[in-house]
């Protein structure tokens, strides 16, 4: 029973670490988008189609993806 608890605890910690890494990667992209000049074209891929969006729309899309992954 103790081995199972240790295993589950390790697995939970690993999942938490991976989630944090993913959030950091998303945050790096968001920071990059924020640094772009106004009027710069930004394209995102949604369901295999590339769509031109504003900088703010791209940031909001990434934030929604972060929330989706956390759920």
Swiss-Prot record:
One of its GO terms (biological process) is protein folding. Pfam families: Prefoldin_2. SUPFAM superfamilies: Prefoldin. Disulfide bonds: none annotated. InterPro entries: PFD_beta-like (IPR002777), Prefoldin (IPR009053). Residues 1-20 are annotated as: Disordered. One of its GO terms (molecular function) is unfolded protein binding. One of its GO terms (cellular component) is prefoldin complex. This is Uncharacterized protein MJ0647. It comes from Methanocaldococcus jannaschii (strain ATCC 43067 / DSM 2661 / JAL-1 / JCM 10045 / NBRC 100440) (Methanococcus jannaschii). The lineage of its organism: Archaea, Methanobacteriati, Methanobacteriota, Methanomada group, Methanococci.
């Amino acid at each position: 029973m103790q081995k199972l608890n240790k295993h589950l605890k390790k697995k939970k910690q690993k999942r938490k670490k991976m989630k944090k890494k993913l959030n950091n990667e998303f945050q790096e992209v968001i920071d990059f988008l924020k640094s772009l000049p106004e009027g710069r074209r930004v394209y995102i891929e949604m369901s295999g189609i590339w769509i031109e969006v504003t900088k703010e729309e791209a940031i909001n899309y990434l934030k929604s993806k972060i929330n989706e992954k956390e759920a």
